Amino acid sequence: FPFSKDIIFEVDSIFKVDLKNFTKIYVFLDEKSMFALKKKFEKYIKNGGVVYSYVYNLPNTTGREIELSNGKKLFIYKQ
């Protein structure tokens, strides 16, 4: 993946933060949390954002699935 020199990492509660100022988000959440955030993530993706989720997928949402060298999966959701 291409990386920019302008990367800023912010750590915050994904349940509280407004995602409109972010172009990409990276999460490692359990199934329950992914389900709870489904609508928020779908809106974010629809508005051009990209969600990278390590191990857990976004329920009933089409995305790209990559198997990593450690055997775990990375799910990528974008428009």
Which residues does each PLM region occupy?
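C-terminal substrate-binding/active-site "lid" region of AdoMet-derived donor-dependent transferases
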Residues: 32-79
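A short SAM/SAH-binding and catalytic strip from SAM-dependent methyltransferases
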Residues: 15, 19-36
